Swiss-Prot record:
GO molecular function, one term: rRNA binding
GO biological process: translation
GO CC list: ribonucleoprotein complex; ribosome
Organism per entry: Verminephrobacter eiseniae (strain EF01-2)
Top-level taxonomy: Bacteria, Pseudomonadati, Pseudomonadota, Betaproteobacteria, Burkholderiales
General function of this protein: This is one of the proteins that bind and probably mediate the attachment of the 5S RNA into the large ribosomal subunit, where it forms part of the central protuberance. In the 70S ribosome it contacts protein S13 of the 30S subunit (bridge B1b), connecting the 2 subunits; this bridge is implicated in subunit movement. Contacts the P site tRNA; the 5S rRNA and some of its associated proteins might help stabilize positioning of ribosome-bound tRNAs.
NCBIfam families referenced in this protein's UniProt entry, alphabetically: PRK00010.1 (NF000585)
Family: Belongs to the universal ribosomal protein uL5 family.
Protein name as it appears in the record: Large ribosomal subunit protein uL5
PROSITE patterns: RIBOSOMAL_L5 (PS00358)
Gene3D superfamilies: 3.30.1440.10
Record key words, sorted: Ribonucleoprotein, Ribosomal protein, RNA-binding, rRNA-binding, tRNA-binding
Tagged with keyword ATP-binding: no
Gene it is expressed from: rplE
Subunit structure, as described in the record: Part of the 50S ribosomal subunit; part of the 5S rRNA/L5/L18/L25 subcomplex. Contacts the 5S rRNA and the P site tRNA. Forms a bridge to the 30S subunit in the 70S ribosome.
Amino acid sequence: MARLQAIYRDKLVPELIRQFGYSSPMQVPRLSKITLNMGVSEAVSDKKVMDSAVADLTRIAGQKPVVTKAKKAIAGFKIREGQAIGCMVTLRGVQMYEFLDRFVTVALPRVRDFRGISGRSFDGRGNYNVGVKEQIIFPEIEYDKVDALRGLNVSITTTARTDEEAKALLAGFRFPFKN
């Protein structure tokens, strides 16, 4: 069992029941999935860029990503329908908790000029999105072997009904929110 999964079961569930007055432990919000998405606009002109992006995301997530393709052609961006434009991976279960642990304790503190993450990035339904500007903040990525700095989006999907419940859940996982 992952460290954060044990913290959730032993400490967070009773704490959230007390805080929000749930009648059953099954009402307590929990993480359902974490999706990592990397848009690779340079892949339009150079196919090798997509291979290195897939390799980076594989190292970060510990699981092979799916290459996302354009749904329709956009002439202004020189994109044709079906062309590879990014990659994404969905984490669930133990891998999700392991990634979240590394993200909060190792990767986020390595961000330059880090002062906490915004508490405004909730979507109104209890899900949280955070953008990472450089993939080199993850310890799995070797700085010398990086061909280009790429950002990625981390979407944390919870079963929480409100943003307040989701923020309490993520704060219990020691998310460094700004005050």
